[in-house]
Amino acid sequence: MISTFDVETSFQITEEGKLDPSPKNPDNFLVSLGINDEYVFFKHRDFKGIPNRKVIQDILDKTTLLVGHNIKFDLLWLWEVGFTYTGRVYDTMIGEYVMNKGIKRPLSLKACCQFRGVIQKSDLTEQYMKDKVSFQYIPI
């Protein structure tokens, strides 16, 4: 099975004013994880339940190819919070870099979608990120 996934995390603001969402920063945590049609909250201001880790691991266990944009970041978080996945991965950002054949183009997901003519939903988080509001505080 081919699966697509993305994580949203908290972040810290560095002394230089940059965002640090690293899973190795002990003050950061996983806010939510989306895989295929499932979206699971882990730690969010508006979420009071218990995250359904089993549904995520069951999908990962059936997955033969995991697809994501800048997937190294998402995989580090996946492993950091205790999920297992050892199958193949495809990174759309690296794929886009290779397809550019040395032409310098932005590699953000938004830029890649615009260049390829992919219709994208409006980015509801863009202003929050500009304002340095972490994902756990963005309304569900």
Task: Please name every model-derived segment.
Residues 1-24, 48-56:
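Long, highly charged low-complexity segments
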Residues 25-28, 36-140:
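Active-site-proximal helix-loop-helix substrate-binding element of RNase H-like nuclease domains
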